[in-house]
From Swiss-Prot:
GO terms for cellular component: cytosol. Sn-glycerol 3-phosphate binds at residues 104, 133, 135, 188, 241, 251-253. The lineage of its organism: Bacteria, Pseudomonadati, Pseudomonadota, Betaproteobacteria, Neisseriales. InterPro entries: 6-PGluconate_DH-like_C_sf (IPR008927), 6PGD_dom2 (IPR013328), G3P_DH_NAD-dep (IPR006168), G3P_DH_NAD-dep_C (IPR006109), G3P_DH_NAD-dep_N (IPR011128), NAD(P)-bd_dom_sf (IPR036291). Its EC number is 1.1.1.94. Keywords: Cytoplasm, Lipid biosynthesis, Lipid metabolism, NAD, NADP, Nucleotide-binding, Oxidoreductase, Phospholipid biosynthesis, Phospholipid metabolism. The active site is at residue 188. This is Glycerol-3-phosphate dehydrogenase [NAD(P)+]. Pathway: Membrane lipid metabolism; glycerophospholipid metabolism. NADPH binds at residues 11, 30, 104, 137, 252, 276, 278. GO terms for biological process: carbohydrate metabolic process; glycerol-3-phosphate biosynthetic process; glycerol-3-phosphate catabolic process; glycerophospholipid metabolic process; phospholipid biosynthetic process.
Amino acid sequence: MKLAILGAGAWGSALAIAFARHHQVTLWARDAEQIRQLGEERVNRRYLPDCPFPEQLKLSSDLAEAAHDAELVLIVTPMAGLRPTLKALTALDAPLPPILWACKGFEAGSSLLPHQVAEEELPADHLYGALSGPSFAREVAQGLPAAVTIASDHAEFAASVARELHSPLLRLYANDDLVGVEVGGAVKNVMAIATGVADGLDFGMNARAALITRGLAEITRLAMALGASPQTMMGLSGMGDLILTCTGALSRNRQVGLKLAEGKPLQQVLEELGHVAEGVATAREVLTMAERLQVDMPITAAVCGLLYQGHDPQQVVDGLLRRSPKSESGGLLD
């Protein structure tokens, strides 16, 4: 399969390395100097310094060249880059291939999910979907086993892409609940910040398990309010992604929580991180949406208080753990 991967950050580079083992891949970035450097060094030294590019991986800063004859375009930018990239693609004087995105989050200001942004920018009958699931870029680039989801409202399209790109080391599963997959992929980043704070304060593994489980309940309530299936939250893009992001040492959002627990201000944390942590921007959008839909999301509210209102990390987590008891008989809906 001929692929164009748009975005040469950590995840874009990792997917390009992984898919180039079995497919024709062109990795695109807007910055011509970045592409020149990547081409000369044949490695993304900033994000994946120990993961060299395969010889067959092509590089380009020309969007038309990268997308030419591609059978599939995969957009791997931060959420803020999705709409501009879609606009640039639709402006090309060429047929538009089917599109997947690996962006996770809600658009700042509009609170739109990725597929809602795509609906505004792509032709009504265009094939599109999301790639999401528990996957750290470094491990995928190193060829370690992983499993992710291809989600689309067009079930046959999702199944076809999953079959084409599936490999023993990167297993792909199709899902027709696009909303559920996107919500799971977005909100788990908020929960990872909370879990990172608890870990940083040495609250212990019991507290971590409680936050992850109740975080899953929050994600499920919001997803259902948006029309998703609760079953999706039990899959790779729900529980799977949540567990990895809340516990993995490579999780950027968990690192944000760990650093906040040290008493560092948010701006310093983000500067030290040097990477995009989508949960920071997503938290505010999620809370706004939850309030509009009247969905109870106490962990999200606590994270927003920590990020934007200067609340003390110790008091934030302690307050969550001291909330009034309630029945769990209704499962994830309570």
